[in-house]
Amino acid sequence: MSVLQELTKKKYSSLKTMFDDKYCPTFVYSILDQTIPGAVYADDQTFPKSFFIGTESGIYFIAGDQGNRDFHDFIAGYYEEQVKSSKRFTLFSSSDTWDSVLKPILKDDLNQMRRAAFSYQPKSFKKTLQLPKGLVLKRIDEDIISHSTAFNSAYYEEYWNSVSQFASKGFGFAVLHGNHVVSECTSIFLGHNRAEMDIYTLEEYRGLGLAYCVANRFIAFCMENGIVPSWDCDICNNSSIALAAKLGFKTVTEYTIYYSG
């Protein structure tokens, strides 16, 4: 594997503004804010131009100068090591130019998916709809996590490193029917005053507007606390795109992810 340099954590904060004028997934800011564990590799410690940033759970982002051949070798080698150890490898590309570079490097080993990134339009915020009788909305805590089927302890261990880390730094809301968690909207990632939303509703409770209600509460919390809500999804996920539009999000860009499995 070609040797690139892992940047020291004291350099993380200075990198955040480098991604402000282009697409950058929220998990990158989570790493740079040191909200979750991760690593930043670059072609130079002092004046980095190419970046490979990843979570411990196997989600990565590549950005910067596409012409560095050593960087190409590093990506190929890193991917091969992940495959050998049967670890997750999900790579977010920052541009179409990077796509053209990555395809020959990764060959045909990985699946590809086009995704859309959305921007929230604050003026379009609407009041919460009334929940159906018998349902209540609460902020997610460790007790709710212990009763959840979708956003359970394994979920937070994967994306937040631990339930306690999420409880300390993250937030989310759930609709409950008794002790039954039926719909949730949580911050899968949080960084640089951005919170990426992840939503799930049990199949038997869909069609009741619960996802809209719980997402609306999530957005309201963001507005109250100076946080920008973030929404990304597969471009073929029509129900997610429709819900995003209803909540006040507009598509700003599309990008490609490469993933194993």
Curated annotation (Swiss-Prot):
Pfam family name, one: GNAT_acetyltran
Enzyme Commission number(s) from the entry: 2.3.1.-
Alphabetically ordered keywords of this record: Acyltransferase, Transferase
InterPro entries, per database record: Acyl_CoA_acyltransferase, GNAT_acetyltra_YdfB-like, GNAT_dom
Domain of life: Bacteria
GO molecular function, one term: acyltransferase activity, transferring groups other than amino-acyl groups
Domain spans labelled N-acetyltransferase: 135-261
PROSITE patterns: GNAT (PS51186)
PANTHER family assigned to the protein according to its UniProt record, in alphabetical order: FR47-LIKE DOMAIN-CONTAINING PROTEIN-RELATED (PTHR31143:SF2), PTHR31143
Family as reported in the entry's similarity comment: Belongs to the acetyltransferase family.
Protein name stated in the entry: Uncharacterized N-acetyltransferase YdfB
Originating species: Bacillus subtilis (strain 168)
Source lineage: Bacteria, Bacillati, Bacillota, Bacilli, Bacillales
